[in-house]
Structure formats: structure tokens, C-alpha cells
Design a protein with these regions (language model features):
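Cytosolic catalytic regions of ATP/NTP-dependent phosphoryl-transfer enzymes
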Residues: 1-136, 142, 155-156, 168-184
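Short, acidic loop-to-helix structural element flanking the phosphoryl-transfer center
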Residues: 142-162
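A short acidic, often aromatic-flanked loop/helix-cap motif at beta-alpha or helix-coil junctions
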Residues: 42, 145-147, 196
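Short beta-strand/loop motif that positions the catalytic acidic residue
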Residues: 165
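Residues at the C-termini of beta-strands that transition into short coil/loop
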Residues: 114, 195-196
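Conserved RecA-like helicase motor-core motifs
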Residues: 186-195
């Protein structure tokens, strides 16, 4: 916070998460009560990353995971609603997916957040198998607008007879909305995903 305005230093996605957390909760940025034990770095194949933390006051061990909403939705068994954790049933899955779709249709980049408690043995030898049976905490929509010069560059490419193709790791609906807004494709264009 600088003169009443947020200023992000470093990775914009991490900065957006920190700003959102600070706006939602007064002590969200106070990580002094947690010790970071390990990190499972982002991998484009699994589309997520995790950290293992120890809450110093209680000794509780946590795995915190963020990544593609569709991946975390598949890996979650529970959902956090306020202070309560409940089974992630089909109604909650559909509600979550509707939120992701609405954010994606608004050209927002979406990331989901989930967590789980670990045993001491799991925390000492963290591996990718721990990123299962998670508790889904929510989804975040991040504005990641194209650079101002992108629209003009695309227009010039089209005028020169160059076919413009957009390749991105974004949610397909986000990618389509951005491509339409930039004049790359019409609104009824087909989006190909990685597996396709």
C-alpha cells in the first residue's frame, strides 16, 4: 500500500493474490506464525503448485495448493464454506464451475485455491500424491489485460495477410473472450485445448 494505492513488486499473479488476501482479511499477510517447509513447484502438466507449511502455534501441518480450477476441482473431496468444511457434492461442483465460467467469460484469468492437513510423515517427504483429497477454498479471477499495443499489432498482421493464432495456458473461455476482444477470431470460433 503506497499512498492509498497498491503497488505490486515481483510476480503479478502472486501480487494479485496478496492484494486480494489483504483486502479480505486484516491479518492475511502475517505469515510470521507459519514456517515454510517445502514447495512442490508449478508444473505445466499438472497445472498447479503447492507449499507445505507448519503453523507454529499449533504445530498443524498444511499443504496449500493453487492452480487450474478444473484440476483442483477434480482433486478436491471437500469444500470450505465460511468456517465449515463439507463434502464437495455435485451441487457445489456445479456452483464452483459456474463461477469459473462466469469469470472466464469476463476474460478473467482464474486460479483455484485448496488445502489439506498433513501428517508429520507426509510433510517430511512431500510428493505430488499429496495433492489429492483437498478442501476447495475458492477461486480467484485476475484481470490480466493484453498489452495496449497488441490490438494494433493484430490489426496490422491481418492487413498484411498474416493469419494470427493465439496460444495460451488460460482457461478456454478466457482465451476465447480475449481473442474476440482483440479481433483475432469471431465470437463463434472453436477453441482447441491442449489435449485436443
Amino acid at each position: 500500500d503506497e499512498d492509498g494505492h497498491w503497488r505490486i513488486l515481483g510476480d503479478p499473479t502472486e501480487g494479485a493474490f496478496l492484494v486480494a488476501a489483504a483486502k479480505l482479511c486484516d491479518n492475511a499477510l502475517d505469515m510470521q506464525g507459519f514456517e515454510r517447509l517445502a514447495e512442490l513447484p508449478f508444473d505445466s502438466d499438472r497445472k498447479l503448485m503447492s507449499v507445505v507449511l507448519r503453523e507454529q502455534a499449533s504445530g498443524r501441518l498444511l499443504l496449500l495448493t493453487k492452480g487450474a480450477p478444473d484440476v483442483l476441482l477434480q482433486r478436491s473431496a471437500r469444500v470450505q464454506l465460511g468456517d465449515a468444511e463439507i463434502a464437495l457434492d455435485e451441487t457445489h461442483r456445479q456452483r464452483f464451475q459456474s463461477e469459473v465460467d462466469a469469470m472466464s467469460d469476463a476474460a478473467l484469468r482464474t486460479l483455484a485455491v485448496a488445502w489439506r492437513t498433513l501428517t508429520p510423515e507426509q510433510a517430511q517427504q512431500p510428493d505430488l500424491a499429496l495433492e489429492q483429497q483437498l478442501t476447495l477454498a475458492g477461486v480467484v479471477g485476475i484481470i490480466d489485460p493484453p498489452r495496449p499495443e497488441a490490438r494494433q499489432a493484430i490489426r496490422q498482421a491481418h492487413q498484411a495477410g498474416i493469419r494470427v493464432i493465439m496460444i495460451t495456458g488460460d482457461h478456454p473461455r478466457t482465451a476465447l473472450r480475449i481473442a474476440v476482444d482483440l479481433g483475432i477470431v469471431p465470437a463463434d470460433a472453436r477453441v482447441l485445448t491442449g489435449p485436443e
